[in-house]
Amino acid sequence: GSRRIRATAWYNGERQTVSVGIRIKAGKSPRTMNYRVVNTFPHDKEAYTQGLFYHNGYLIESTGQKGMSTLRRVEIKTGKVVQSVNLDQNYFGEGATLYKDEIYQLTWTSRKGFVYNPQTFSLIRTFEYLTQGWGITTMQDTLIMSDGSNVLYFLEPKSFTELRRVEVCDNNGPVSQLNELEYIQGKVYANIYQTDRIVIINPASGMVEAQVDFSNLLKLSDRHRNIDVFNGIAWDEENQRLFVTGKNWPKLFQVEIF
């Protein structure tokens, strides 16, 4: 990440200060991991997937595009949308997560988010933030948000105030375009926007410890005219299942990383 070093000295009774900015890289390159497909399921090919997480046997999915943004409950095996709420047409839906039996959903440039009842999808309250909203996930009693840069913001859930932030980097420098997030077994998994990569981040240091390339996941025969980028990570902790998909992808994949 970025750091600034400042030196102050006194000369002939005058104080002089010099500062210089430096950029810190990770000490070693990320481990390259592989994946295998465990299961393939249908996915709504008109769902512009922005956020995804597992809850009580279903996937909760946040979709984007103005006039098409939703929060929905999806049956995994069939891809059927069993419950849905539409956002106002002025909002572009983004990431979503569950914290203490409440669903948090971001919007892209409106700097406004929504909190829902996870059973009824009724709106409980709204919240505001100072950046764009991209991805969001839950780490114990903290929310972690991305804004498309290389920064992860750690937020207090009730007030949405910033507790701290880390800059994400690897051995080559900053890793930006952090998009959808999922907290899995002590690490933050992040989609890198406009790529088929997921990076695995140490949330304390911001260092990218590993990465997975999913370039060949979606077959050419499944790529229709409105297909968009790889995005969406969901983790079923109880059954140790990892799900990934993409925007307007016709399929959802259960994968294993090794």
How should these model regions be labeled?
Residues 1-5:
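Exposed beta-strand face motif in extracellular beta-rich ectodomains
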Residues 25-46, 76-82:
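A short helix->beta-strand "capping" segment at the edge of beta-propeller domains
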Residues 78-133:
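Blade-loop segments of beta-propeller domains
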Residues 38-72, 84-97, 134-135, 246-252:
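Beta-strand-rich domains and repeat architectures in extracellular enzymes and scaffolds
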Residues 45-56, 89-99, 129-142, 172-186, ...:
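Beta-rich, blade/repeat-based domains predominating
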Residues 36-42, 80-87, 121-127, 164-173, ...:
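A short beta-strand motif characteristic of beta-propeller blades
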Residues 61-66, 104-110, 145-149, 190-194, ...:
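Conserved beta-strand positions in repeat-built beta-propeller and related beta-rich domains
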Residues 74-79, 117-121, 157-160, 202-207, ...:
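Short loop/turn segments that connect beta-strands within beta-propeller blades
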